[in-house]
Amino acid sequence: MMGSYAASFLPWIFIPVVCWLMPTVVMGLLFLYIEGEA
């Protein structure tokens, strides 16, 4: 995953990861934190 291949491949996989996966992880961590505090 180096060079021009990574440069052309990365944006297509990075956008859905940031838009969908990161919020899901953050919401999951917040849920676990809130449940742990309760």
UniProtKB/Swiss-Prot annotation:
Bilayer disposition of the protein: Single-pass membrane protein
Protein name: Photosystem I reaction center subunit VIII
Family from the record: Belongs to the PsaI family.
Keywords: Membrane, Photosynthesis, Photosystem I, Thylakoid, Transmembrane, Transmembrane helix
Keyword Phosphoprotein: no
HAMAP family assigned: PSI_PsaI (MF_00431)
Gene of this entry: psaI
GO biological process: photosynthesis
Domain of life: Bacteria
GO CC field: photosystem I; plasma membrane-derived thylakoid membrane
Role played: May help in the organization of the PsaL subunit.
